């Protein structure tokens, strides 16, 4: 993945599955989950590629229900994430965010700002993230399988619940 051709190929396969499977299937565009090898050291050029080539082609073919951006240390910054989400919104592609797996990144707040369906991971969380989600429609999603497999701390699910927030659990299995 992480090239225009590879991302489109994967999403076209998902489209075929959606058309033939007897269950509901949703497609996530994951081109903003890491920077492609050819763009190492040229992060802003890769963000340009996502915004100016990948997302327009994904939208033109109607291939994705969601765009999922990994807003965390070593991946995409809050500013880059916002830029990608703004471009996706132009095409009606709804956002999801992976954030706070490695450090408190600001990804929760950018997810809330852009009305993301969910913010996923949340292994590293402060009270600021919990407060940001209160009153929003963005779903905090814990991925305990990822924590277990990578030896990371588990998210503060109880604190989210005590704050009156719903919490979703997911596998992060891909």
Predicted segments with their positions:
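Metal-coordinating catalytic core of metallo-dependent amide/deamination hydrolases
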Residues: 1-106
């Amino acid at each position: 993945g992480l090239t225009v051709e590879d991302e489109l190929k994967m999403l076209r396969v998902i489209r075929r599955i959606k058309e033939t499977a007897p269950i509901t299937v949703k497609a996530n565009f994951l081109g903003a989950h890491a920077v492609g090898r050819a763009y190492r050291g040229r992060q802003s050029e890769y963000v340009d590629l996502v915004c100016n080539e990948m997302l327009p082609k994904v939208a033109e073919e109607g291939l994705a229900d969601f765009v999922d951006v990994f807003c965390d240390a070593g991946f995409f910054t809050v500013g880059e994430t916002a830029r990608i989400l703004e471009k996706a919104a132009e095409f009606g592609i709804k956002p999801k965010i992976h954030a706070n797996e490695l450090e408190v990144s600001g990804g929760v707040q950018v997810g809330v700002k852009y009305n993301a369906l969910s913010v996923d991971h949340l292994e590293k969380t402060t009270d600021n993230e919990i407060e940001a989600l209160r009153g929003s429609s963005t779903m905090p999603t814990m991925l305990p399988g990822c924590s277990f497999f990578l030896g990371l701390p588990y998210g503060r699910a109880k604190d989210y619940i005590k704050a009156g927030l719903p919490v979703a659990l997911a596998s992060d299995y891909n």
